[in-house]
Every structure is written in C-alpha cells, then in structure tokens.
Amino acid sequence: MSLTEGLFFKSLYEENKVTLLFLHGGGGAGWMWQPVVDRLTEFHCLVADLPEHGGSMQVKPFSMKLAALKAAELIREQAHGGKAIVIGLSEGAQVAVQMLADYPAVMEKAVISSALLLPMPGASMYSSRGLISALFKMSVPPFRNSDWWIRLNMKHAAGIPDAFYPQFKAGFQEMTESQFVNLMVANQTFRMPEGIEHANVPALIVCGSHEYKAMKDSARSLSSKLKCNQFFQINLGQGSGLANEHNWAMTAPQAFADTIRNWLSGQPLPGVLS
C-alpha cells in the first residue's frame, strides 16, 4: 500500500511491463476492483481511491477535474514509462473521460464503462446542493446502523455482491454530507468535456443493455466524439438488470477481466458484449 501526496493506491504485480490504472465508481473505493484485478495478474495493476473516497478522503472536494488531475499524477509517478491503460467504471469512467480531454498523454488506451454524460430524468434537482443535502439527511444518518437498508442499497442500487458487505457498510457509515453532495453533483452534472475530440487514445466504450436511455445515449455520443474507439453493450443474460450490468466488474468479474485482456491483445471479446 502506498500514499502519495495525492491519491491512496495499491500497486500490484509490479514486475509486469504494462500498467493498468483502475478507477472505481462513486461511493466505493479501490476494493471494488478486487475480483477483476485478481484475474489480471499478468499486468501491473494500480488501484486508486478517488478523491473524497476511502483512503483519499483528505483529497477534496471531489470534482471530475480534480480526480483527473490526481489520476494523471499517479500515472506519471507510478506507471511504467509514465503511461497507463485507464479503466474506469461509472464515476470512474467519467473521470477517465475527463482525462481524455485534459491528460491524454498519460493514457495508452482507455476502457470506459457506463460514463454518464447526458442529463437523467429529474436531473435539474442535482443543481441544488441544498436539495441533495436534504436527501442525504433523509437517507443516510437515520440508517447508518440499519443492515437491511444498507443491504438494500448495496444490492439493488449499487449491484455489489454480498461478499463485499463489510466494505460497503463501512463506506456507508463513514460517508459525510459534503462527500455525498460533492459526488452527486459531480456525477449528475458532468457533460462531454471540451477538447475531447482531440484525444488520440484508443478506447473501448461499454454500457449495459438494461441501463437508462441517458446512459446508452451517453456511450453513443462519446463514441461519436473519439477518433479511435469501439462501442459495445453488455447483456449478462436471463435475469440481468440495470444494477448488475452497470457494476459488471463485480457481478461478472471473469467477463470483465476477459474483456480487458482480449481487447488489449486483439482477440474476440466475450459473448456478453454485442
């Protein structure tokens, strides 16, 4: 484990030449990537905690710009050759998109899974920090010790398997009002960053086939902006839904790892992608 002036991170399998940087979803931390990283032992894996998350709580306030800056600094300092393949999911994918606009020189390639770039229905409320603060006060402090509420959110909102309940519960119990507000505002108001069309970074863009229309349209819009990319939708089969496709790094880690490995080596992608 290491702590730079910026982000807390873990550096695994450092003997391998190619560096992957993993950027997690909002409200979680680097632990979310464990099932995938355990299957990619042939790569040097950097697993970061984003600003105002996990071990990087002191790096704040969270914003896409700040997160992109700190992730780029981490790559320059820790990645082999000062460049990495950046893999982002959900809010981490939004950070990767911001990096494509601001710091493409540190990115060999990018895997962008479910980056929201367009307004969701009712998104206007997220411009009001006061409303989000009220939402926090109603939905978090009264339930900090409520296992059923935490499990409900973990499974149906976040798509996180039961094995990671201790980590999810700890994050829920430690969440602050400012963290919640900053994350929600950043996530829901993020739009296509200026200058991204100039990024000459090969990208794999994915989203779930059961995700919201705004998410699918965001992926298509990003694909239309980038010079060199492939766009796929995820379908995890019968019983699949929004949450488990959105967080497929945890619900289908073998498929996620195989997607990374096969895309980087030019092999056919797993059948869950079409």
Predicted regions and their residues:
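Conserved HGGG/HGGXW glycine-rich cap/lid loop of the alpha/beta-hydrolase fold
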Residues: 7-57
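Active-site loop/oxyanion-hole signature of alpha/beta-hydrolase fold enzymes
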Residues: 46-87, 244-250
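Gly/Ala-rich beta-loop-alpha elbow adjacent to hydrolase catalytic centers
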Residues: 88-92, 96
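Flexible "cap/lid" loop of the alpha/beta hydrolase fold
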Residues: 101, 109-139
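Conserved alpha/beta-hydrolase catalytic His-Asp/Glu region
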Residues: 121-123, 141-197
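Short beta-strand/loop motif that positions the catalytic acidic residue
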Residues: 199, 205-207
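Conserved alpha/beta-hydrolase "acid-adjacent" motif
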Residues: 212-218
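Catalytic active-site module of serine/aspartate enzymes centered on a nucleophile-bearing elbow/loop
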Residues: 229-274
